[in-house]
Amino acid sequence: MKKLIYLLVLLLLLAFTACSEKDNPSEVKILGYKLDQFINPDTVRIHIDTQAEADLEYRSLFAYEIVSSTDGFSPRQSAYAGYDLPWETFSQGYYVPNDDHRTWFPGMGLPSAFKVRNAGLFRLYRKVDVDAGNRGSKLIELRGLSTYTVDNWSDTAEDAIKLSDLLQGIAAYDSVAFVAVDGYSKNYQPELINDGYYLLNSEVTTFPNFNSTLPGNMKKFKKLAKINVYGATSAQNFDFALAPQEKADLTFTIPSDLSGFESTEMVTEK
């Protein structure tokens, strides 16, 4: 009788263990920290304009490079990546200290190069998106373009880029719409684009040969975020250079003390 009871207990324990393993597979729970927490919105806003409205997302005006603190590696150097991330992608990533301080972008389909080991800092580069509809789109880092010295609206020399350089690779088009960070937009014809510049520090356009005849809201378009291209006859077949690292607009580091940051429990099966 005792042997029978012992056998029944043993069978129950084995059944319980089997069910437990089935219901709870081997999982490792680790903490991740959303990357957007490491990019201070006020610092970015003030860099764009000290008088800028605080309720707008100025971090969307930049491309983001993730850099290793040990060997300086970034996805820019990888043959499988070779680019920086827009805010919409970067902000959804995580910093995971328990996984060799790597960055994770779960479910986003990014190349493995973006899983940067010992991630230590982020470099920000001012960019503009150019959207030619079904002809494709480009993310263009402004400091990767040729710069020119142009008089700004205070009659002081300032670095600027040609507006036409943002449309390199498009054979012809009918018109464009400039879109600001707040969604405000204005249409421009090719002759204005070919004449105009974007002042990199003032964050405003100027059209040297047309300023005297243009209304203020056209000649001084501020905080350019995007260009919509209408009537493009071709895709934008041009390989834009990334901005040099030494010309990064802003840099943020990951602190060693993360006690002031919100963590997210992340689950991965081993």
Can you say where each PLM-predicted feature lies in the sequence?
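N-terminal regions of proteins, emphasizing targeting and processing segments when present
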Residues: V9, L13, G231-T233
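N-terminal intrinsically disordered, low-complexity segments enriched in P/E/S/T
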Residues: E21-K270
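Sec-dependent signal peptide recognition
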Residues: K2-L10
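C-terminal motif of bacterial Sec signal peptides marking the signal peptidase cleavage site
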Residues: A15-A18
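N-terminal hydrophobic targeting signals that begin at the initiator methionine
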Residues: M1-K2, S20
